[in-house]
């Protein structure tokens, strides 16, 4: 959504003015029908929210595409492409977001309850846009679903404070991920499978998740859920979405109750990356054809080895190291990062 008083011409002039101030960049016109860059996306998401509220059945976006070419090839040397992308993102996108938001507030006198969601900036090389990706690997918690399952388990079991204390200790560096994970799982001992089933029923898919998986599969992608969470929930979500395969931690369950243990090895960040690599090798897919999407620090290893690592409404450290960041749209924003002009409606 853009302020009504900001036209297509304004955007073109704005980008050109930024380029005029940058001695390192040229703006190249690659298509004459620039007005056709306005795109409507129809997202057929019908899953209910946690409050059983009706979700809007579509996301509308206005897309502007420009080819920025460096004056010299220095910026595009291997190892510097991400830095070049962040120059554009930090300077052009940040300023554009600020100015457009200010214009919107001035023209609409927006109240404090109104919010203008604009500008996700994806920097793509021409070679990247022409590349055919075949494997898409997703994190689960806060990516394919809106919740963090361990938090939901802790709330239900009444051990929220204990779990939080372990998490904070890990963040202070007092224990590694595997140790903190094992301690949190131990606190789940005695929880019945009835409780697990109840939590499954309350999990909500992220906006655009159903359409994104459906569209990727229609495009020929093999889809994988790679989670540091639990298979009990990951398999349920994968079934809801039609994801091809699942990798997560298997909770030990005995006589209908959680034992407080998981089967080793624990799926941590390094294991996630290994799973992605082994899956690609098994399917005969090059790593240059792999896309990984996540939100947490434990997703960074798999994002780093993929051709495209996408941060989805992620922590700052993840956004800073990702190839692309989605902050405005639902998961369907992945298709912009992949270079698709629009996401066609799906049933």
PLM regions and their residue ranges:
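Non-catalytic pre-domain segments flanking phosphatase-related domains
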Residues: 1-138, 346
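C-terminal cap/substrate-recognition subdomain and adjoining C-terminal extension
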Residues: 12, 190, 195-347
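Exposed alpha-helical structural elements
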Residues: 14, 91, 95, 99, ...
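Residues that form generic nucleotide/phosphate-binding pockets
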Residues: 18, 99, 103, 156, ...
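Alpha-helical substrate-recognition element adjacent to the catalytic core
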Residues: 59-62, 67, 127-131, 140-251, ...
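Residue-level marker of motif borders
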Residues: 134-136, 168, 290
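A short acidic Gly-Thr/Ser loop motif
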Residues: 136-143, 295-296
């Amino acid at each position: 959504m853009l302020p009504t008083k900001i036209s297509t011409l304004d955007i073109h002039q704005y980008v050109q003015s930024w380029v005029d101030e940058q001695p390192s960049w040229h703006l190249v016109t690659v298509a004459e029908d620039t007005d056709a860059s306005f795109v409507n996306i129809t997202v057929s998401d019908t899953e209910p929210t946690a409050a059983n509220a009706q979700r809007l059945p579509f996301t509308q976006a206005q897309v502007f595409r420009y080819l920025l070419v460096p004056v010299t090839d220095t910026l595009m040397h291997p190892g510097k492409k991400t830095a070049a992308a962040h120059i554009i993102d930090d300077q052009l996108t940040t300023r554009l977001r600020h100015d457009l938001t200010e214009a919107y507030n001035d023209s609409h006198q927006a109240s404090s309850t109104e919010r203008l969601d604009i500008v996700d900036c994806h920097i793509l090389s021409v070679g990247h846009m022409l590349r055919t990706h075949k494997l898409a690997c997703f994190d689960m918690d806060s990516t394919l679903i809106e919740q963090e399952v361990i938090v939901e388990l802790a709330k239900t079991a009444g051990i929220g404070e204990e779990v939080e204390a372990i998490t904070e200790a890990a963040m202070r560096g007092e224990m590694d991920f595997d140790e903190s994970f094992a301690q949190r799982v131990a606190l789940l001992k005695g929880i019945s499978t009835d409780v697990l089933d109840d939590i499954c029923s309350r999990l909500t898919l992220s906006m655009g998740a159903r359409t994104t998986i459906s569209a990727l599969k229609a495009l020929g992608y093999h889809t994988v859920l790679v989670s540091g969470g639990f298979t009990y929930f990951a398999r349920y979500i994968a079934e809801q979405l039609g994801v091809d395969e699942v990798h997560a931690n298997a909770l030990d369950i005995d006589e209908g109750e959680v034992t407080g243990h998981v089967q080793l090895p624990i799926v941590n960040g390094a294991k996630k990356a290994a799973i992605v690599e082994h899956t690609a090798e098994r399917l005969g897919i090059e790593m240059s054809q792999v896309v990984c999407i996540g939100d947490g620090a434990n997703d960074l290893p798999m994002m780093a080895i993929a051709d495209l690592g996408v941060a989805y409404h992620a922590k700052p450290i993840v956004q800073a190291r990702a190839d692309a960041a989605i902050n405005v749209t639902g998961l369907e924003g992945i298709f912009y990062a992949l270079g698709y002009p629009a996401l066609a409606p799906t049933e």
